[in-house]
Amino acid sequence: VATLTVSGGIATATYAGAHPFKVGYVAQFAGATPAGLNGNKAILSVTGTSVTFAAPGVPDGAATGTITSKAAPAGWQELFAGALANVIALKPSVVEATGCVLRVDDTGAINARVRAYEAMSDISTGVGMTPLESQAAGGLWWPKSATANATARAWILVADARGFYLAVAPAGGDRYTLLFAGDIASLKSGDAYGYLLTGNQ
């Protein structure tokens, strides 16, 4: 962030070049004084080199400090970090979540393998697995690329604290596979199993 100024309760962050934000995105600012400018901020407007966000109670003027910004984290917790190369276990960290765990095995060249568990005791062991081995041996498939090469593939991730959509274009172009993992709005109050995992069999 090159400059950060406040006027009338609206903060404007200006960048030396382009930025990744769009209206409605949540950015995480750090390093600013006054401290009320730090934290997760919903983006109100954008130009090619600036963004604005609400700064209620912050006095007008220029902020000081080494100010940084990045996309705000969605609030998922990594379990068993570094326990197995190219394998990750994630679960929502908010207290109202089901607590179900997503396990992603990203060792394959063109597909990742995914499973969900009610709980996991280590990176390879869990209870309440879905899909069952009898339903999809090895888990569901999440496509990454149609070919095993270094060609970049477009992807989009939209996440909140309880679930995320992942859209991947494995063959390139604008044909995406839409995937989901996370809690759903259950019709049953207090549904401890209101979790959905999609993928290919």
Predicted segments, located by residue:
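Small/polar beta-strand repeat architecture
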Residues: V1-I10, H19, G31-Q201
